[in-house]
Amino acid sequence: DKRMQSLATALYFITKSMDTTRPVSTNDGWENLDDTDVVSIHDYAYDDEEFDRKYIEADINTVSPVGRVQFVDGAKYRGQPILFTEFGGIAMQTDAKDGNWGYGVGASGAEEFYTRVKNLIRGIKRCPFQGYCFTQLTDVQQEVNGLLDSDHTPKFDLTGIGSFEIKHDGGFYEEKEL
């Protein structure tokens, strides 16, 4: 919607006129505009190989996470930091019922859940992003895709998550030997 794009652009410049020290994101997840200080992506890929195909092997200007364009007509990537602000979204199959859901096919158990989380994080770290945020920490209402359930009980042994360390080298995240 061109009106919404115009509104987002106007708000970007109004915000910048009031405070030039802070980055402004005009849209989070997809349909980014030229007037933005960061490019953000939401993508609930099933596995890390999908991240490779979309974000290492392809042009960021042409990717379509979750069926949405990454940039609106005429806008393009101009070297801004890229933040992967939502990925993961894994539900346990036993929880994804009665109106509750996650993204894609649910994990069959705690071991598969852990393995998929680990592989997605490793995949993200291979991509040329400056930051990422896993979706999500806890289950929230009908979204049962958290690392913890709604009572904050872990869905798997979380002690291994600390081993997913990041080594920063030249703008790319590299996997550290586990």
Summary of predicted features, one role per range:
Residues 13, 52, 56-178:
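Substrate-binding clefts and catalytic carboxylate motifs of secreted carbohydrate-active enzymes
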Residues 25-27, 42, 85-86, 135:
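A cross-family glycoside hydrolase active-site/sugar-binding cleft signature
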Residues 33-45, 49-53:
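Short, well-ordered secondary-structure micro-motifs within conserved domains or adaptor modules
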Residues 1-38, 79:
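Active-site neighborhood of glycoside hydrolase catalytic domains
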Residues 3-4, 8, 42-46, 150-154:
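Short, charged low-complexity intrinsically disordered segments located at boundaries
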Residues 1, 20, 29-30, 44-45, ...:
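Catalytic metal-binding/acid-base residues of hydrolase active sites
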